[in-house]
């Protein structure tokens, strides 16, 4: 069983390398037309250049997974902001794409919790489609839209989970098919359990990104031993292995909050269930210390008898 690792957005080991520098709309409004254009251009350019630095860092450390920052283009989906963020940076998008393709990196996006398809308010669905389209356009500009995924949560329950799920199935029909083809769903820590998310994924033929921390915070009746094989099966129509999210609680009191690093003892039960399936899968680390937490966790895992480190960020068990 091969386990490959990655992390989210910021490389903590790199100095001044945020790929998510931004500008608020309030600040944006105070600028002249030319100043607005210059500010958007400068901030986006810096985010793209920082992304390139991060990719070089990942390549050097043989880190095969990476989640791009959704804030890579500031105010990209704001209705009052017009900005050709694709055409203005074609060489940089292509440079990012070349690095990703040459080194066979697995890239993803994870829009925020407001990108959802369960609402009874049409404008919420419209905004979700706009946001998904933005993420897809970025992946397309990079040249990896057909091999990368945009991960979201199911959404809210709005007092009636069954009706909300029905709305999801209806509202998702409005998302263009080529974008839906590149989306994944993740179980959340308060509303939609692993079993409920799995059922939706199976009906819509959407790959399921399983989050173990969320699962433990929002348990369902079905045991993980039964759920995980079915979760992995939702990836069978793709040409890539399943991906899971790993983090551990900040504390017992703040169980849903992410800790700085990974608590191996918290994760061990999941790993033992995965080992029984013995299926290759990828792991996205969602701890606060990102790449540093990932590398420390890999080091801890590699010290367990039977687990072999076969590259800087890949283990075999």
Curated annotation (Swiss-Prot):
**Is Hydrolase set as a keyword in this record?**
yes
Q: What is its EC number?
A: 3.-.-.-
| UniProt entry tagged with the keyword Ribonucleoprotein | no
Q: Which UniProt keywords apply?
A: DNA damage, DNA excision, DNA repair, Endonuclease, Hydrolase, Nuclease
One annotated GO biological process:
nucleotide-excision repair
Q: Which InterPro entries match?
A: UvdE, UvdE_bac, Xyl_isomerase-like_sf
Which terms does the record give in the GO molecular function aspect? endonuclease activity
Among Pfam families, the record links this protein to: UvdE (PF03851)
| Uppermost EC category | hydrolase
What is this protein's function? Component in a DNA repair pathway. Removal of UV LIGHT damaged nucleotides. Recognizes pyrimidine dimers and cleave a phosphodiester bond immediately 5' to the lesion.
Family note? Belongs to the uve1/UvsE family.
Task: State the protein's name.
Answer: UV DNA damage endonuclease
Q: Species name for this entry?
A: Bacillus anthracis (strain CDC 684 / NRRL 3495)
